[in-house]
Amino acid sequence: MTNTKYYPEVSSNADFATIEKEILKFWQDNNIFQKSIDIREGDAEFIFYDGPPFANGLPHYGHLLTGFIKDVYARYQTVRGKKVERRFGWDCHGLPAEMQSEKELGISGHLAITNFGIEKFNAHCRDSVMKYAGEWEQYVTRQARWVDFKNSYKTMDKNFMESVLWAFKELYNKGLLYESMRVMPYSWACETPLSNFETRLDNSYRERADKAVTVSFVLCHPVSKSTLDVIPWLDHGIQKTINNDSANCSMDPVDKPRYDTENFLGITANYKEYRILAWTTTTWTLPSNLALAVGSDIDYALVPKGDVCYIIAASSVSKYAKELELKGDEQFTIIKGSELQGLSYKPLFDYFKNHPNSFKIFAGDFVVEGDGTGVVHMAPGFGEDDQILCESKGIKLVCPVDNSGKFTKEIPDLEGLQVFDANDKIIIKLKEQGNWLKTEQYIHNYPHCWRTDTPLIYKAVPSWYVKVTEFKDRMVELNQQINWIPTHVKDNLFGKWLENARDWSISRNRFWGTPLPVWKSDDPKYPRIDVYGSIEELEKDFGVKITDLHRPFIDELTRANPDDPTGKSTMRRIEDVFDCWFESGSMPYGQAHYPFENKQWFEEHFPADFIVEYSAQTRGWFYTLMVLSTALFDRPPFLNCICHGVILDATGQKLSKRLNNYADPLELFDKYGSDALRVTMLSSNVVKGQELLIDKDGKMVFDTLRLFIKPIWNAYHFFTMYANADHIKGELNFTSENVLDVYILSKLKIAVEKIKESLDSFDTGTAYHAVSEFFEVLNNWYIRRSRARFWKSEKDADKQSAYNTLYTCLETMAIAMSSLVPLISEAIYLGLYCHPRKSGDPEKPECLDSRLCGNDNLSVHLCDYPDLSKFKINSELVDTMDTVLDICNHSLFIRSSENARVRQPLSSITIISKNNDKLKSFEDLIKDEINVKSVIYRDDLENYAVKKLSINFPLLGKRLPAKMKDIIAASKKNEWEVTSGSLIICNETLNSDEYKLILEPHSHIKGASSFAHNSSLLILDLELTPELIDEGIARDIVRFIQQARKNADFAITDRILIDINLPKITDIYGEFIKEQTLGKFAKDFIPDHISEIELDNHKLQLKIKKVN
């Protein structure tokens, strides 16, 4: 007989953080990550795109969540036999880097940067952008995520930037680019426009209180006979028909309107003036007003106040009752908005009073009733709708606000004032002029800069645009080729965004970014535009060697304008750089330096098989990838995409350093291990796009450790402890005929198959559930029911079969779940493969780093996924044993609810079912597990219980709201029937998810519970006889002795002496107690351990001693 211990000594109270660090070191020392790629050389590839983060900040829980998901599928596809390269990447350009540099340099704004020097500023950006790269690698490595940092790409690398230039020129050549002056979301804090989709990113909108003002505009429309035909409500005694020339309408900006009876609208004796009321939340745009808009079909009321008649949407009159001095019983003349079209009004201010074609009322389909007056003031330099409407009427925009959001000299009395700071001064001026009617506090969601958290403005700026609207229908078509998780993203969140896509502004008037490769003539008399798509083209035209594509080096490239015969004009680059989202969207080809290098590689690695980020990236990275992929290649950029949700604190607030509402992830890793955090995140609904609330103290992670990781480890600990004690080595074996072995091996195949199916469909939640469900059965059924096989002293075939089966379960599951819990799986796998030393002490296993040298499967992550063809499933046995397990679980529930402890034997259990014949072969098992003396079988279910209908009211109420009252009444009366498997109530057939049938025992029956999906009933006899009570005490003695053995730190194989003074029990049940505890009863020995216990209302001493 050998005394070899084949497995390491495993503690039941393992320090998982320490174990994980040992595994991480093992991976590093043995280059396991690279081996996992190398062994798949020549195999099919799984293409994975790793979205580039910024490295100028530390990783947060959102990054870790995304990283966990990426790692799961990369590892899973590897064990499925595919080669998975995982090249890391870094976003380097854009506002995050610039804002950080401005802060560190103590400067702010375009002028300050220019004075500081663009070269020095960009050099600082280059140095600081990778500030936390080392910390990123530490976090990513500690979370057990495998990525290739050594060959990482950076968007600031010359090769990447050149691919971006190529993409731009391709779009230009396809006619998909244009330059225009358009109103865009504008960050005055960053002095740059933002894309429309950037205002849709998470938390871009904040609740904000603004002063909303209502102002009056004086009508001064000249009237002719034809005008009266169109606007009959003006005909109240016209003094004179005059020439239809709105230019004669004039107004002093401070004084009252002046009227010339020979040239201006005659006003009846009833009204001195007509004033139309407009409401706005952007008071600062009023100095730039050039028009008003009304709704053609909206009703407008003529509301008199003294000798002035106000025009306002009829639905808004009541909101201005105080200001218009209404009593509540007035009747007003009502006109349609269409009757206001074409009227002129006097400018509020004289800043642009001579602006052509301005100061008229037009119809706009964007005008709606609700907030305000039903009249929208138009400032085409500061509103998208305003610009579109005004341009259609021949009104050119004005924009008297500079890049920093301050008024220019065009508004002399507000020059240099920040627009939001000008609101109060403008209101004062309106009051002085008599145009003010009302100011109110208006609380609304307003877009803010995603980098500076300052409120945006909408402002006309020159920019280059991608004509997304020209091919958005094609994007919608290509989107149908993508598998989205969750599925509703395809046609809702992402699909509807694509349907409503706008042209994309891709230029930014900033400094640190890939420069737009556009050169223009500096003389408009000889216009010319050159667009470059490669370094070679630049070097050819400018005759210099290009070593850096950044500003200011690229700005210094000039040449004579070839189209200027005088030779005096020069081609100069426009100052703009790319929107950094354009660079992110260029990642698939940028990382490969396509098309200048790796052309075949790119074509074989595009599109990606898989991509993942949080849901807001449907407006960000996913979107820009889609735009550029469609425009350049007419293909979707990826085939499978997970949109996960966001992580919030326990109260639902965003995780924030300022709020101090989350723990440093590294602290959690050191406390509970990263596998526990991985399971916590990826088993939740956050992977399905929902929110995950996580507490600062890590209780959720601890619960995962306790409820998910520990059961896995407990099974491994049990195996190694008993296998070492018996000096038995387990082997893979799928052919045992023992009924428990066949059952657990069948359940093993079901679990492994479920994990595979789940991960194939990108569903980690179901995969984790399959793991947890299997180990629940393995620990609490198979191991517990097989203890006698492990404990018996003879090493027969049955004992070896039990070890082989448990070994097979552990090794197979270690491989199957290796992507889900990579560190713990590795620890278990390595432990199972631990061989004895060839020399030295055979009792001690080899060290972690050396014991597997020369083994092909050096790591669980180098294995192939379990071959399901090796497994056989006995479906009938599984169904029956699952029912047995269901019976036992419900019996335990009854015991718990009736305060009948498990160790207390009961006389009988009655099983009332139509499938009793299959259960009878497991009668001894049921009796032993439930701790009853007999099993009674019956099939007359109707004598013991009745079926009740339970309706899913929220679900059914959506489908049949009108019938719910009748259905509820009928369900209470049991007026329903099941026909051909369908439930019918009130002549309606219910869907399976709209109801449940509950088996309800008759009220006089105690100790009863339904099982087998409410198809059967069991009843425990809870009456206790003296004999049953005594046997229960004997079983309690066994428990106390076992606990004493544990407290005394005895080995499981140690035999002991026992001294307890309870002869009434020990005389009858002595043999049972000795057998269960490896003990003998004795007196007068010196104990190794003494316990004070209470049994049968008596306090006793329990003494035990280990026998040498």
Curated annotation (Swiss-Prot):
Catalytic activity: tRNA(Ile) + L-isoleucine + ATP = L-isoleucyl-tRNA(Ile) + AMP + diphosphate
UniProt subunit comment: Monomer.
Entries under PANTHER family matching the protein: ISOLEUCINE--TRNA LIGASE, CYTOPLASMIC (PTHR42780:SF1), SOLEUCYL-TRNA SYNTHETASE (PTHR42780)
Subcellular location: Cytoplasm
Keyword line: Aminoacyl-tRNA synthetase, ATP-binding, Cytoplasm, Ligase, Metal-binding, Nucleotide-binding, Protein biosynthesis, Zinc
Alphabetized GO MF terms: aminoacyl-tRNA deacylase activity; ATP binding; isoleucine-tRNA ligase activity; tRNA binding; zinc ion binding
Comment, domains: IleRS has two distinct active sites: one for aminoacylation and one for editing. The misactivated valine is translocated from the active site to the editing site, which sterically excludes the correctly activated isoleucine. The single editing site contains two valyl binding pockets, one specific for each substrate (Val-AMP or Val-tRNA(Ile)).
CDD domains: Anticodon_Ia_Ile_ABEc, IleRS_core
Family membership: Belongs to the class-I aminoacyl-tRNA synthetase family. IleS type 2 subfamily.
Name used for this protein in its record: Isoleucine--tRNA ligase
HAMAP family: Ile_tRNA_synth_type2 (MF_02003)
Short motif ('HIGH' region): ranges: 53-63
EC number: 6.1.1.5
Binding site for ATP: 657
Organism: Rickettsia bellii (strain OSU 85-389)
InterPro entries linked to this entry: aa-tRNA-synth_I_CS, aa-tRNA-synth_Ia, Anticodon_Ile_ABEc, Ile-tRNA-ligase, Ile-tRNA-ligase_type2, M/V/L/I-tRNA-synth_anticd-bd, Rossmann-like_a/b/a_fold, RPE4
Functional note: Catalyzes the attachment of isoleucine to tRNA(Ile). As IleRS can inadvertently accommodate and process structurally similar amino acids such as valine, to avoid such errors it has two additional distinct tRNA(Ile)-dependent editing activities. One activity is designated as 'pretransfer' editing and involves the hydrolysis of activated Val-AMP. The other activity is designated 'posttransfer' editing and involves deacylation of mischarged Val-tRNA(Ile).
UniProt xrefs under NCBIfam families: ileS, RPE4
CC terms in the record's Gene Ontology section: cytoplasm
Pfam families xref list: Anticodon_1, DUF5915, tRNA-synt_1
Cofactor(s) this protein requires: Zn(2+)
GO BP terms in the entry: isoleucyl-tRNA aminoacylation
Motif 'KMSKS' region location, chain numbering: 654-658
UniProt keyword ATP-binding, yes or no: yes
